[in-house]
Amino acid sequence: MIGFTCGAFDLLHAGHIVMLEESRSRCDYLIVGLQTDPTIDRPEKNKPIQSVYERFVQLDAVKYIDNIIPYDTEESLIDLLKSQHIDIRFVGEDYRDRDFTGSDLPIEVQYTSRQHSFSSSGLRKRIEENEKPH
C-alpha cells in the first residue's frame, strides 16, 4: 500500500514526526509532497521561514519517509496526486469536516490524530517570545 501526505513542513517539529510515524505505520511506502511555498496561491498562509532545500534535507532524514516530491501550487498537488499510484492519503483530523485539495479524487482518505499540542504556529510564537529583550 502506497501512502501520501503533504505540507510545507516549515520548522519541522515533533508534531510533524508523530504524524509521519502514524502515516507510515498504516502503509508500506510513504510519499511526502513538500509544498515549496503555500503563499503562492493561498496568501492567507504563512510564508515558510526555511528554504525548500532546508526542509527537504530535514525530511530526507526522517526514517518514516520513503520519497519526497516537491510541488508548488494546489493545482500541481492535484497533478501529483493523479500521477502517483496512491492507495491512501493521510490528512490531519482537523480536516475531517472540511473540503481540501484533492478530496474529490478516488483516493482513500485516512485521518491522522492530533493528540498533541505541537504546531508550526506555536513554535513561531515561542521563538518570537524568546527573541524579545528581557
Indicate where each model-derived feature is located:
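Nucleotidyltransferase catalytic core that binds NTPs
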Residues: M1-H134
